[in-house]
Amino acid sequence: MLHIKTIEGQLDAKGLKFAIVATRFNDFIVDRLIGGACDYLQRHGCDRENLTIVRIPGAFEMPLVAKKLAHSGKYDGIIALGAVIRGATPHFDFVSNEASKGLAQACLESGVPLGFGLLTTDNIEQAIERAGSKAGNKGAEAAAAVLETVRVMEQL
């Protein structure tokens, strides 16, 4: 069988610096996501002093702040954490779509990996499930994704 070169990222955060952009809106959910992300990174070797949390009002502000952090050159990876919960108006669609597109654009323009932990749920129960109960912790999952991507990018 032919050997095919495979590039994979090791889940070792030692020596890396991360910024977490987290919304204040729905903070009782977002605080759990932050806890999951920080716990994951620290369990994988990231020193507490290499983590910076930037609190912002809401999801719409995330792309601008993530882009500024990514272009600062201070961080190996950015993690975006927030919770947008559907209401009775189309506001949910506008905010979640623009935040998602803006975060992807910030990542692509800067070349700095970004972990996407912006919950977009139909109700509060779904958000709670994704912030550390039945559906795991999406903050930890975003941290895992950005860590692995940072380590892959180092090899490319």
Curated annotation (Swiss-Prot):
(2S)-2-hydroxy-3-oxobutyl phosphate binds at residues 88-89, 130. Keywords: Riboflavin biosynthesis, Transferase. The lineage of its organism: Bacteria, Pseudomonadati, Thermodesulfobacteriota, Desulfovibrionia, Desulfovibrionales. GO terms for molecular function: 6,7-dimethyl-8-ribityllumazine synthase activity. It comes from Nitratidesulfovibrio vulgaris (strain ATCC 29579 / DSM 644 / CCUG 34227 / NCIMB 8303 / VKM B-1760 / Hildenborough) (Desulfovibrio vulgaris). GO terms for cellular component: cytosol; riboflavin synthase complex. This is 6,7-dimethyl-8-ribityllumazine synthase. 5-amino-6-(D-ribitylamino)uracil binds at residues 25, 59-61, 83-85, 116. Pfam families: DMRL_synthase. Gene3D superfamilies: Lumazine/riboflavin synthase. The keyword Transmembrane does not apply. Its EC number is 2.5.1.78. Catalyzes the formation of 6,7-dimethyl-8-ribityllumazine by condensation of 5-amino-6-(D-ribitylamino)uracil with 3,4-dihydroxy-2-butanone 4-phosphate. This is the penultimate step in the biosynthesis of riboflavin. The active site is at 91 (proton donor). The gene is ribH. GO terms for biological process: riboflavin biosynthetic process. NCBIfam families: lumazine-synth (TIGR00114), PRK00061.1-4 (NF000812). The keyword Membrane does not apply. Belongs to the DMRL synthase family. Pathway: Cofactor biosynthesis; riboflavin biosynthesis; riboflavin from 2-hydroxy-3-oxobutyl phosphate and 5-amino-6-(D-ribitylamino)uracil: step 1/2. It catalyses: (2S)-2-hydroxy-3-oxobutyl phosphate + 5-amino-6-(D-ribitylamino)uracil = 6,7-dimethyl-8-(1-D-ribityl)lumazine + phosphate + 2 H2O + H(+).
